């Protein structure tokens, strides 16, 4: 009785287990009997697969189950001249492969199981050709013949066309690769050491390793195809049996997903690795709806030979995410296409709607050898978000998008095209650290670009978009095209140089606005747009052999926008747009075209040099220029007074309808030993206190200040006389005089014909003429009353304003018309009684 009950319990357990864990095959391989495939095993671990159906140089096998146990093997004992082995699994159970798959010769192996495929930690390959693991329903050939895993009893394969395609089902199974994970020894400034690289799923050089299924996950999985291709394609459900054509490319294959309307998800976690590096580096292509590379995983193509490398492409129709935006960060997560020899590197391309770079993750396009790198191109139709990582709010790790050259080769260009671009604790860098020129950076965002340097409560870190030279090569340029550009709290856009190579240019085209804003009190950071030649820090001087004082020239900054706003904070560093040279070279030019420019709280537009010629500043403003609260526009040369500084200061040219300088704001063009350069302001209205505009030199010749009224015509102006006229013939006798009084006249117009006349509005510019023939009004009395006439000033309402000597706004009154006549009486004659 007890045995009967135990047997019932056991039977129930088996039934329940089969319901709870469906479609997981046991570790075995068996033929389904539809083809002449034979499977033999002496120990239940190692399986010998023979026979099958041969058509020309293609071999077909059919299995009801196909799973390889741990430390076991599946050996396809094919003839050496077989080109392709097609293996289907028809039993409806997932293939669980945790051992070795072998084949003879150079045959390509296709493993087809619509139910799904799982590779374990011990899975490995020993085949001479390419390997395809797919959850497609069938392989369809060009002549219409189909090798189906869902309808295995179709007509026999008598003749086939060599060009196959994968017929995907409406709900393809998933593919998972579990593995030990691999953390390579590499960084932003160093190539990856692959000498102790582990292996899992690996094909011979030049071949293709492809996973084509529903959702595809690599959890520590290692995929390697030296000089070949890694193709991962996640095909989603509801595709109406879409076809994926396969095209031979060299010894590998290319997949065409143009007929697939719905894609699945691809995820790399737990230090997963995709690697096509080697003496001939290959290509990597990931395609899905969402693609995630995180948890210290790496996608790597590193060219170590003389042939050119292939491209790295991540195409996610919805989202591509590199790194993880959580407390753990992803500082060892990389997507990299590198070259360390004479062969050129490939391109790194990301195509998606939304691209995210999180947690200190890195996109690299570096060259360490003579070979030129490719280009980095990010196309995200909706948004690009790059956010760094601060594990303890003390230290920070920026998310990095880098193109670096350490050799004679030019660094690769970086281009981002999107609708909205947002950066926080993240860097976009194109640098040269060798003899080659730096790469160019182009940011295209239809709507807006927002760059935030520091985050409140987090110490350290910043955000920069930087093209720089730390060697002999010239730095690259930065170009920004958007509607609105916003930089805040230590964010920077710059082209820099620290050695012999010149700094590049910075060009900003923002149709609506450019805003630079500092809100955090932090004396180490400044929000800025700059072209700078700086002095290298000691560690850079040691690493790259740099001189303590550079000889490079600064580049030019050009900004075109409707509204430019630069604002610091009363307790913070000052936001600024600057061209600066701390070495022996010259400063670059700074050109801004805008409708309005507003500077506040110590904001500055500046050009300065240590020794060379100062750069010019040109502001072409349609409406108004306003400087408030100690803001400045300066052009300086020879900032180090102890050095032999002979550079002249740069010119400042301002064209604006209105110019306002308030609350201690200044416009200066100064030099040390060189000459102070000129300041030219053309405006209809200029408001500011005395001495707010200077052009000087410490030891050289001061510059000139020219303030022109845009409405004053230059035609007809003549030179004024320098000598006084004969006053006896210019003023009629009879003028009243008092003690210590004097009256001088110079010029050619602007006074009445005789002292009895009155100056009215229409007569202000009357000519001076000889009055020797005019009669005398009457003699002046010998005595007079020296007491001034007391007239009580009327009290009237204020109806106008002026800027007083302190620079403050003061309300004043204009008198009525009857009183105005007395105010306008410009005569020194005595009235007749």
Language-model features: where?
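Extracellular and secretory-pathway beta-repeat/beta-biased strand scaffolds
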Residues: 2-833
């Amino acid at each position: 009785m007890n045995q009967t009950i135990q047997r019932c319990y056991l039977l129930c357990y088996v039934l329940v287990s089969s319901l709870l864990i469906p479609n997981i095959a046991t570790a075995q391989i068996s033929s389904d009997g539809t083809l002449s495939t034979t499977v033999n095993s002496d120990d239940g671990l190692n399986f010998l697969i023979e026979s099958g159906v041969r058509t020309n140089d293609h071999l077909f096998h059919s299995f009801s189950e196909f799973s390889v146990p741990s430390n076991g093997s599946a050996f396809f004992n094919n003839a050496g001249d077989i080109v392709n082995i097609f293996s289907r699994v028809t039993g409806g159970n997932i293939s669980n492969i945790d051992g070795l798959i072998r084949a003879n010769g150079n045959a390509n192996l296709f493993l087809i199981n619509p139910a799904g495929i799982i590779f374990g930690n011990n899975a490995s390959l020993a085949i001479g050709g390419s390997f395809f693991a797919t959850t497609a329903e069938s392989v369809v050939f060009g002549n219409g013949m189909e090798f189906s895993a869902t309808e295995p009893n179709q007509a026999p394969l008598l003749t086939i066309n060599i060009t196959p395609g994968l017929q995907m089902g409406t709900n393809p199974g998933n593919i998972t690769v579990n593995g030990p994970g691999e953390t390579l020894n590499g960084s932003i400034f160093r190539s990856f050491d692959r000498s102790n690289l582990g292996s899992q799923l690996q094909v011979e050089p030049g071949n293709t390793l492809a996973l084509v299924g529903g959702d595809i996950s690599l959890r520590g999985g290692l995929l390697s195809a030296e000089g070949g291709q890694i193709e991962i394609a996640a095909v989603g459900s509801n595709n109406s049996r879409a076809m994926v054509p396969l095209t031979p490319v060299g010894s590998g294959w290319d997949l065409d997903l143009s007929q697939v309307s719905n894609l699945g998800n691809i995820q790399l976690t737990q230090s997963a690795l995709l690697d096509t590096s080697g003496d001939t580096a290959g290509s990597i292509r990931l395609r899905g709806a969402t693609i995630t590379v995180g948890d210290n995983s790496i996608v790597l193509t590193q060219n170590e030979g003389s042939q050119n490398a292939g491209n790295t492409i991540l195409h996610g129709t919805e989202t591509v995410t590199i790194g993880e935006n959580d407390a753990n960060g992803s500082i060892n997560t990389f997507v990299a296409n590198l070259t360390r020899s004479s062969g050129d590197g490939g391109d790194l391309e990301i195509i998606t709607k939304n691209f995210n770079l999180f947690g200190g993750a890195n996109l690299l396009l570096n060259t360490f050898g003579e070979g030129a790198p490719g280009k980095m191109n990010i196309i995200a139709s909706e948004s690009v978000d790059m956010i760094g990582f601060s594990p303890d709010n003390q230290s920070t790790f920026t998310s990095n998008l880098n193109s670096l050259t350490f050799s004679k080769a030019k660094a690769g260009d970086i281009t981002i095209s999107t609708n909205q671009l947002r950066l926080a604790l993240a860097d976009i860098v194109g640098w040269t650290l060798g003899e080659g020129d730096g790469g160019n950076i182009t940011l295209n965002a239809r709507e807006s670009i927002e760059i935030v340097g520091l985050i409140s409560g987090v110490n350290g870190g910043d955000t920069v978009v930087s093209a720089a030279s730390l060697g002999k090569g010239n730095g690259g340029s930065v170009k920004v095209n958007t509607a609105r550009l916003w930089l805040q709290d230590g964010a920077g856009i710059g082209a820099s140089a620290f050695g012999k190579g010149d700094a590049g240019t910075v060009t900003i085209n923002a149709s609506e606005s450019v805003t630079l804003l500092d809100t955090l009190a932090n004396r180490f950071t400044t929000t800025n747009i700059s072209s700078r030649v700086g002095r290298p820090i000691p560690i850079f001087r040691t690493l790259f052999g740099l001189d303590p004082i550079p000889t490079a020239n600064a580049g030019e900054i050009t900004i075109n926008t409707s509204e430019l706003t630069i604002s610091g904070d009363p307790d913070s560093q000052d936001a600024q747009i600057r061209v600066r040279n701390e070495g022996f070279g010259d400063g670059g030019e700074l050109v801004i075209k805008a409708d309005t420019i507003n500077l506040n709280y110590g904001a500055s537009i500046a050009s300065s040099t240590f020794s060379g010629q100062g750069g010019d500043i040109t502001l072409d403003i349609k409406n108004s220029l306003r400087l408030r609260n100690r803001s400045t526009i300066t052009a300086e040369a020879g900032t180090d007074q102890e050095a032999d500084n002979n550079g002249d200061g740069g010119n400042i040219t301002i064209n604006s309808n209105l110019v306002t300088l308030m609350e201690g704001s200044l416009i200066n063009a100064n030099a040390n030993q060189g000459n102070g350069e000129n300041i030219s302001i053309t405006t209809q209205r200029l408001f500011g206190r005395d001495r707010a505009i200077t052009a000087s030199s410490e030891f050289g010749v001061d510059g000139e200040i020219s303030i022109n009224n845009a409405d004053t015509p230059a035609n007809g102006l003549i030179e004024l006389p320098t000598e006084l006229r004969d006053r006896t013939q210019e003023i009629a006798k009879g003028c009243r005089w008092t003690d210590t009084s004097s009256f001088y006249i110079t010029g050619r117009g602007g006074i009445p014909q005789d002292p009895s006349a009155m100056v009215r509005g229409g007569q202000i510019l009357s000519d001076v003429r000889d009055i020797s023939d005019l009669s005398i009004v009457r003699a002046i009395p010998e005595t007079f009353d020296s007491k001034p006439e007391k007239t009580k000033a009327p009290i009237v309402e204020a109806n106008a304003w002026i800027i007083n000597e302190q620079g403050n706004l003061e309300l004043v009154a204009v008198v009525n018309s009857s009183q105005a006549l007395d105010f306008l009486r410009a005569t020194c004659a005595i009235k007749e009684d």
